[in-house]
Amino acid sequence: MEALRQKVKEDGVVIGEKILKVDGFLNHQIDAQLMYDIGETFYEQFKDQKVTKILTVEASGIAPAIMVAYKFGVPCLFAKKAKPNTLNKGFYQTDIHSFTKDKTNSVIISEEFLDEHDRVLIIDDFLANGDASLGLNRLVHQAGAETVGVGIVVEKSFQQGRTRLEEAGLKVSSLCEVASLSGNKVTLVGEE
């Protein structure tokens, strides 16, 4: 996705050698047209998978996930980082470590919204070490459902996330792959 690659190059802010801040279009302020285009792209990549549900984790994955769900015509479900008082039925739960925030959250999904009949496409904003997607995949398995793929908006390919997801048997598609953040500069795969 050339528009996304351009945004990452022009608007991404490098913080150290492992963190890329994309608040201007994805993680704080959202570029709606770009999210729509992301939805279309993931739809084209996974349209033959008979997807019944899109799954992400709150909060930054929600914007692209909603657009993907819109294109598929299926619900978008997000794992919550806290159990609300309104959740009085059963739920699936797992721990997910956030690379960016260096914090582990216990995330939950109501049993009401995910079951063994679902074919789930996981969507996330970033792929670093793969903890978020692996955690979401654990929730899918708890429900007896099937993960048909993982769609990543921005992958930091210099980290181990893709390898870990593929070792878990997951099909991974990334729209923008960052090769390096060295020298306070974003270098995309293919530019090295």
From Swiss-Prot:
**What pathway annotation does it carry?**
Purine metabolism; XMP biosynthesis via salvage pathway; XMP from xanthine: step 1/1
Any idea where this protein resides? Answer: Cytoplasm
Catalytic activity reported: XMP + diphosphate = xanthine + 5-phospho-alpha-D-ribose 1-diphosphate
Q: For xanthine, which residues are the binding ones?
A: 20, 27, 156
For this UniProt record, the keywords arranged alphabetically read as follows:
Cytoplasm, Glycosyltransferase, Purine salvage, Transferase
| EC number per UniProt | 2.4.2.22
The residues that the entry says bind 5-phospho-alpha-D-ribose 1-diphosphate are 128-132
Molecular function via GO: xanthine phosphoribosyltransferase activity
Q: What GO terms describe the biological role, i.e. biological process, of this protein? A: purine ribonucleoside salvage; xanthine metabolic process; XMP salvage
A Gene Ontology cellular-component term: cytoplasm
| Pfam families registered for this protein in UniProt | Pribosyltran
Record note on quaternary structure:
Homodimer.
Similarity section: Belongs to the purine/pyrimidine phosphoribosyltransferase family. Xpt subfamily.
Which HAMAP family does this one have? XPRTase
Q: Mind telling me what this protein is named?
A: Xanthine phosphoribosyltransferase
- Organism per entry: Staphylococcus carnosus (strain TM300)
Q: Which gene encodes it?
A: xpt
